[in-house]
Amino acid sequence: MYDSEFEDITAEELKQFIKSHNEKEYLVVDVRQPDEYTKGHIPGAKFIPLNELLSDFSGLPANRDVIFYCHSGGRSLAAASMFSEEGITEKTIYNLKGGILSWEGRTLKGFPKIQVFDKTKMPVELLLTAMDLEKGAWRFYTYIMDNFEVDPILPTLEQLSKAEITHAKTIYRFWEKASSTPMTFDQLYESLKGEILEGGESLATALAYLENIEKNPCLRILELAIHMEYTAFDLYKTMAEQEKDRTIQNSFLTIAQAEKSHMRMLVRSLDQCV
């Protein structure tokens, strides 16, 4: 087993990478849905839908660099993360930033960008960041359920929205002990803005564009949700690494595992977007 991580790669970097490497040295993997792949894909890419990929990584090589891509980067982020955790390869794993849109020289105008957290913050600050992210996730799922026709994936969204509040309460117990001026959970949760997006942009405003962006906003919603759950997963792993108390560390790892399960739930729902 190898201790593997993954790296982001831009479209221009990937094009140069392909020009400078032998085909036997790398594999490009398209993790989108079948109808997306047939409409256009990176030449030579191996097609493995994300749901199928996460069920069995055995089709990927251990002796070649692997580059994952999707529509705009959310699903491939999950693919790269989970493949790296398998420890199958000693080679480099890449995630194509911006997905096939960036490859084609396009961008998804207005697509919400998940806020990146500062890993150098003190533990008590990371705890607040984590609770804010959980509230943001809850706001995201609630907004989607209230404003979009998402019947095929509604049970998944309902389950996830409830889980976000449960996670926030779990984190609160640790924050309460670490804070010099603790308040009740309800007071703190109410005070949190739940801003999971860069620049403090309104979540409702940022997501409203999804209604008209494509014929199938379901995929775009799930892709953003997968990206959001990955961010939470990464945050909890970081907090676990920084925490010296074994009990708290294990709790963060448990929540990180739950966030990974959320990613898998969302991936399984991709086939419902027809």
Can you describe what each PLM-predicted range is?
Residues 109-112, 179-216:
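Carboxylate-rich helix-loop segments that flank metal/cofactor sites and access channels
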Residues 126-146, 156-161, 170-172, 221-241, ...:
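A structural feature that tracks compact, well-ordered secondary-structure segments
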Residues 94-100, 104-121:
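Active-site-adjacent scaffolding segments
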Residues 57-102:
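Catalytic cysteine-centered active loop of the rhodanese-like fold, especially the PTP/DSP P-loop
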Residues 150-151, 245-246:
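Short loop-to-helix capping motifs
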Residues 1-27, 31-39, 108:
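Flexible, polar/low-complexity N-terminal or interdomain linker segments that lie immediately upstream
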Residues 146, 152, 162-163, 168-177, ...:
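Long, non-catalytic architectural segments outside compact domain cores
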Residues 16-20, 55-62:
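Short amphipathic alpha-helix with an adjacent loop that forms part of the alpha/beta core around
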